[in-house]
């Protein structure tokens, strides 16, 4: 059984900053290399400023060409009535859901993009 690059990246994405730093140190020791340039360039700023985000906001940026399909997708995702969903879509950019987990946010984004919407996760 072989691990794909995508599986490795997914595993690293789920790690905390501390765990990533420990992984980098272990890789430096095992392979006899140094990641000093990469750490200095981006790691210092990222480590101090960015903590692992656990809650995300799903923002409808625009409805695109197929507004009816987007309204249906918004209704299904939010449980809003037809009038409320249409008002939300017409008022884009607008927050669809706030404080959701990453997996739910990604699934909602995929569903809405398949309907033709432009969606952002913040």
From Swiss-Prot:
Family matches, as InterPro entries: Ribosomal_bL12, Ribosomal_bL12_C, Ribosomal_bL12_C/ClpS-like, Ribosomal_bL12_oligo, Ribosomal_bL12_oligo_N_sf
A molecular function (GO) term: mRNA binding
Span of the signal peptide: none
GO annotation, cellular component aspect: cytosolic large ribosomal subunit
Ribosomal protein recorded as keyword: yes
SUPFAM superfamilies in alphabetical order: ClpS-like (SSF54736), Ribosomal protein L7/12, oligomerisation (N-terminal) domain (SSF48300)
Keywords of the record: Ribonucleoprotein, Ribosomal protein
Biological processes, Gene Ontology terms: translation
Gene3D superfamilies for this protein: 3.30.1390.10, Single helix bin (1.20.5.710)
Membership in a protein family: Belongs to the bacterial ribosomal protein bL12 family.
Quaternary structure (record): Homodimer. Part of the ribosomal stalk of the 50S ribosomal subunit. Forms a multimeric L10(L12)X complex, where L10 forms an elongated spine to which 2 to 4 L12 dimers bind in a sequential fashion. Binds GTP-bound translation factors.
Job of this protein: Forms part of the ribosomal stalk which helps the ribosome interact with GTP-bound translation factors. Is thus essential for accurate translation.
Name of this protein: Large ribosomal subunit protein bL12
Record organism: Vibrio vulnificus (strain YJ016)
Record gene name: rplL
């Amino acid at each position: 059984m072989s691990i794909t690059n995508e599986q490795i990246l997914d595993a690293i994405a789920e790690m905390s900053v501390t765990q990533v730093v420990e992984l980098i140190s272990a890789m430096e020791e095992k392979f006899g290399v140094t990641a000093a340039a990469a750490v200095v360039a981006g790691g210092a700023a990222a480590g101090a400023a960015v903590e692992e985000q656990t809650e995300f906001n799903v923002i409808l940026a625009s409805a695109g060409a197929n507004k009816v399909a987007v309204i249906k997708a918004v209704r299904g995702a939010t449980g809003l009535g037809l009038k409320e969903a249409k008002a939300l879509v017409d008022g884009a950019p607008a927050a669809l859901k706030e404080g959701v987990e990453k997996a739910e946010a990604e699934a909602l984004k995929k569903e809405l993009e398949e309907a033709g919407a432009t969606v952002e996760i913040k």
